[in-house]
Amino acid sequence: MFLKSEDIEGKLTHWISKDHAEKALNGEFEFAGGGLHSKPIGLWLSWNSGWEDWTSSEWPAWMERKICLQAKLKPGLKLWHIDTFEDFIRVWNEFKTFANIKEENTYMSMISLYDSKKKGIDFWDWLKEKKVDGVALTDEGQWATRMKTWLYGWDAACIVVFDPKNVELK
């Protein structure tokens, strides 16, 4: 359910526009406001070529405007590890607003995710309060949650780290 950053295995990359790469390498980040509540604001990393594989088949033109940076997580980070639907639902059901969501209606909980944000209750802020530093979605977890949850738009194995200072880019 949770992993330490030093237990993450495999290649981590961050794709960024050529115009912003130098700033990112110097630790300066600009994030646009989260358009989708299902995607938290943070530094998004491709894990084991998940994003590269997805974009090369689904959106090849996207990569033409980007460059690839190697990424390394700082040690000691606590990441919500989603490798199965059960990994997702255990944490999701701890969130007071959505307790006891059942598998068959999990996707509908996305509507509740939007509603709770309007009421000032934010799932991502709640995770941060629990000292969770980010989310690590495996390829298996992406497929297990894709049609059942609001993780549908995540598309590939990835890691999002809420505070970009916890990632070293090269």
Feature roles, as predicted:
Residues 2-32, 36-37, 59-170:
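Active-site and NAD+-binding cores of ADP-ribose-processing enzymes
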Residues 42-43, 134:
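Beta-sheet entry/capping signal
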Residues 43-66:
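Aromatic- and glycine-enriched beta-alpha-beta binding-site module
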